[in-house]
Amino acid sequence: SECLVGSEMCIRDRAVTTIVSTDMAAPVAKKYGVELRRTLTGFKFIGEQIGKLEAEGRADRYIFGFEESYGYLSGAHVRDKDGVNATLLVCEAAAWYAQQGKTLLDAIEALYKEFGYYRNALCSFAFEGESGMHTMQNLMKNLRANAPAEIAGYKVESAVDYDTDGTGLPRANVLEYHLAGGHKLMIRPSGTEPKIKVYLSAVGESEAAADAVNAALSKAAAEIMKV
């Protein structure tokens, strides 16, 4: 984060990520005064945000975009993930920290100590056969009708239904549960395959603590999916 923005930070610079990407981006962006926008899953939506800034004559205010499935882009030169750009960013960061006698591992550990150990995981549940899609539809319908009060022992403090809640994003068949402790679980059926993806996000004072939360959330997700 320090390497990317450093002394070049300007008020209302914008970073963009997706709703299923790490929540660690929010406190980092807040520290540096960066506006963080979240989009639906898919780098094309990040590209749309660049286009909106360009239409406002503010394309230079876009500084970075990323998604959980390893897509990165700094600068507004393209509207898609850029592997070469990402590689150069890693090299630049490694060199920047090396000048301070640090490694990239030192840098990420410092971020964890400052903001908390954020750990993400993805569970995928298949619903095969002719009845698979129907089963998925019923499962999502039941979750909307009977919202859980707790998941894995963590109270559901708030829930977002991206299909109905007026999030400012295009409607999507996604349910998001914010849990006590800053943890999160999201449920998103695939639009092309008979499977449901469950995204887990945990934060703790150590890597082991966050991983333990995700392990509990994973078991709870399997129970919800009845797998």
Regions inferred by a protein language model and the residue ranges of each:
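Phosphate-binding and adjacent anionic-ligand microenvironments
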Residues: 12-188, 195-199, 206-213, 218-227
